[in-house]
UniProtKB/Swiss-Prot annotation:
Known function: GTPase possibly involved in regulation of the MEK/ERK pathway.
Family the UniProt entry places it in: Belongs to the small GTPase superfamily. Rab family.
Descriptive protein name: DnaJ homolog subfamily C member 27
Domain J: 217-273
Major location category of this protein: nucleus
Alphabetical keyword list: GTP-binding, Nucleotide-binding, Nucleus
Species this chain originates from: Gallus gallus
Amino acid sequence: MEANAPKRKEARKSLRIKVISMGNAEVGKSCIIKRYCEKRFVPKYLATIGIDYGVTKVQVRDREIKVNIFDMAGHPFFYEVRNEFYKDTQGVILVYDVGQKESFDALDAWLAEMKQELGPHGNMDNIVFVVCANKIDCTKHRSVDESEGRLWAESRGFLYFETSAQTGEGINEMFQTFYSAIIDLCDNGGKRPPSSMGVGFTKEQADAIRRIRNSKDSWDMLGVKPGATRDEVNKAYRKLAVLLHPDKCVAPGSEDAFKAVVNARTALLKNIK
């Protein structure tokens, strides 16, 4: 071989990763995986019994990835089975049904279960999470809007995608972004790069939007007690207006929350002499 012969570019090392799916029963976890891996939709619901395991190879950027997917049953009955599979995970697919508010509300419980099983030495900050707001094809029955789901995900530094296992909408984009983030994780020594954790808004802003969305009346929305004075109402309003003004807050749902606060103040001041 000649001394000046060009060297072949060395292929980047392939990766082997572990991914798990989490979420309540019947939210479409298995259907999302089948839609991506097998390019098909299974219309008949077949409950996952314990754990469904599969292996697939994908090419993302210039890397070959061997993915071990553990599709975990969502029914509480299978807790004793799935609790063995949380450890040594690089990626988590969190799924809820946009037409079932209870499946969205249960996401916190799923995270708590995982944290408990990982133990005191487990670090969930070094796992890539993607939240799938699934079944968006069923828009007539939607009970969790996009801004609410996106706020929950992004306030935790999670990826967020609107998906439909039935039509395939959002599925490929979700997996490609998910796997790309896991590559960055592995290339960064098993730690999420700092840039992937920035969300552009504060926890205080996210909490305020959630409280406003779930408030039962105008008093509750502004955080004042019934019978509050005009000055107390205006003070509470000014604090929220500064916090949530659309020009200063990029959190999902901030514009609607700001409008709701303006309307709440107007309604309360009409009845205060």
